[in-house]
UniProtKB/Swiss-Prot annotation:
<dbReference type="Pfam" id="PF00316">
    <property type="entry name" value="FBPase"/>
</dbReference>
<dbReference type="GO" id="GO:0006002">
    <property type="term" value="P:fructose 6-phosphate metabolic process"/>
</dbReference>
<feature type="binding site">
    <location>
        <begin position="113"/>
        <end position="116"/>
    </location>
    <ligand>
        <name>substrate</name>
    </ligand>
</feature>
<dbReference type="GO" id="GO:0042132">
    <property type="term" value="F:fructose 1,6-bisphosphate 1-phosphatase activity"/>
</dbReference>
<comment type="similarity">
    <text>Belongs to the FBPase class 1 family.</text>
</comment>
<dbReference type="GO" id="GO:0005829">
    <property type="term" value="C:cytosol"/>
</dbReference>
<feature type="binding site">
    <location>
        <position position="112"/>
    </location>
    <ligand>
        <name>Mg(2+) 1</name>
    </ligand>
</feature>
<feature type="binding site">
    <location>
        <position position="89"/>
    </location>
    <ligand>
        <name>Mg(2+) 1</name>
    </ligand>
</feature>
<dbReference type="InterPro" id="IPR033391">
    <property type="entry name" value="FBPase_N"/>
</dbReference>
<keyword id="KW-0479">Metal-binding</keyword>
<protein>
    <recommendedName>
        <fullName>Fructose-1,6-bisphosphatase class 1</fullName>
        <ecNumber>3.1.3.11</ecNumber>
    </recommendedName>
</protein>
<feature type="binding site">
    <location>
        <position position="110"/>
    </location>
    <ligand>
        <name>Mg(2+) 2</name>
    </ligand>
</feature>
<feature type="binding site">
    <location>
        <position position="206"/>
    </location>
    <ligand>
        <name>substrate</name>
    </ligand>
</feature>
<feature type="binding site">
    <location>
        <position position="110"/>
    </location>
    <ligand>
        <name>Mg(2+) 1</name>
    </ligand>
</feature>
<feature type="binding site">
    <location>
        <position position="113"/>
    </location>
    <ligand>
        <name>Mg(2+) 2</name>
    </ligand>
</feature>
<keyword id="KW-0378">Hydrolase</keyword>
<comment type="pathway">
    <text>Carbohydrate biosynthesis; gluconeogenesis.</text>
</comment>
Length: 332
């Protein structure tokens, strides 16, 4: 049995930025995940369920667990003195860590994806993305350090809190998964170099918003529902409403996750920096693809911290089909 800590040290030589700092940074995220796992499992017994009454930078009501997870991850990262600052879906601006000006890395995160599902005991997750800073080491980080395209990521991953808690990450050398053993307090390697199955058969989208979708996406949904033995259709529809949980299932079983633009969210709803980029990095490392319908997600130059984007991620052939339908059936 190999633990996450042992695996990270063993694989350091495989990526170009192999340093003790990055290893320690991933260990800090691991610690934060353990704390969140512990408290999610007793959320109904302590007063951390439901809405907090506050709103985040996008005007969305924050759940109590959103704020809890954000603070625990932030504290775990700051305690190691290896991160110069963070950007979070739950923070209006970047958070500069005082006394960490010589740290090389910045972290972007969605502390608790799908948190509205907590009240009904559905899987949720944590998403993280790691970059090397671009401003001079020894100075405080600025927003410039965070507004980097996804193809500059050093590492990315997610933690899914479900029937078991799993941490999945990449440093650009494959995707690896670890299951948390609460009796030992360690994450243990369960899958190395994960890949999407060759053919996907599941599509994940909130079809309740069908009337609001672009024409190309509507056509693709109909394509998924049509019977065609040569392409193994119809596909199966599965949608949890938690990006991490939907992505994780599709990574294991094969499929595509779709979150297109709508009339109320013309730029899409998912955040480029906190959700799209890290999941796109993981998808490509697992042999999949990620797109906004027209452009590779990892090539998009971000303009603002909380920028949104349409998002299609999963098996490469399925994402390519969506792109084709969007090209062929543009909105009037």
């Amino acid at each position: 049995m190999k633990t996450l800590g042992e695996f990270i040290v063993e694989k350091q030589h495989e990526f170009s930025h192999a340093t003790g700092e990055l290893t320690a940074l991933l260990s800090a995220i691991k610690l934060g995940a353990k704390i969140i796992h512990r408290d999610i499992n007793k959320a109904g017994l302590v007063d951390i369920l439901g809405a907090s009454g506050a709103e985040n930078a996008q005007g969305e009501v924050q759940q109590k667990l959103d704020l809890f997870a954000n603070e625990k991850l932030k504290a775990a990262l700051k305690a190691r003195d290896i991160v110069a600052g963070i950007a979070s879906e739950e923070e209006d601006e970047i958070v500069v860590f005082e006394g960490c000006e010589y740290a090389k890395y910045v972290v972007l995160m969605d502390p608790l994806d799908g948190s509205s599902n907590i009240d009904v005991n559905v899987s949720v997750g944590t998403i993280f993305s790691i970059y090397r800073r671009v401003t001079p080491v020894g100075t405080p980080v600025t927003e410039e350090d965070f507004l980097q395209p996804g193809n500059k990521q050093v590492a990315a991953g997610y933690v899914v809190y479900g029937s078991s808690t799993m941490l999945v990450y990449t440093t650009g050398c494959g995707v690896h998964a670890f299951t948390y053993d609460p009796s030992l307090g360690v994450f243990c390697l369960c899958q190395e170099r994960m890949r999407f199955p060759e053919k996907g058969k599941t599509y994940s989208i909130n079809e309740g918003n069908y009337i609001k979708f672009p024409n190309g996406v509507k056509k693709y949904i109909k394509f998924c529902q049509e019977e065609d033995k040569s392409t193994n259709r119809p596909y199966t529809s599965r949608y949890i409403g938690s990006l991490v949980a939907d992505f994780h299932r599709n990574l294991l079983k094969g499929g595509i996750y779709l979150y297109p633009s709508t009339a109320s969210h013309p730029d899409g709803k998912l955040r480029l920096l906190y959700e799209c980029n890290p999941m796109a990095f993981l998808a490509e490392q697992a042999g999949g693809k990620a797109s906004d319908g027209k452009e590779r997600i990892l090539d998009i130059i971000p303009e603002t911290l909380h920028q949104r984007r349409s998002f299609f991620v999963g098996n490469d052939h399925m994402v390519e089909d969506v792109e084709r339908f969007i090209r062929e059936f543009p909105d009037a």
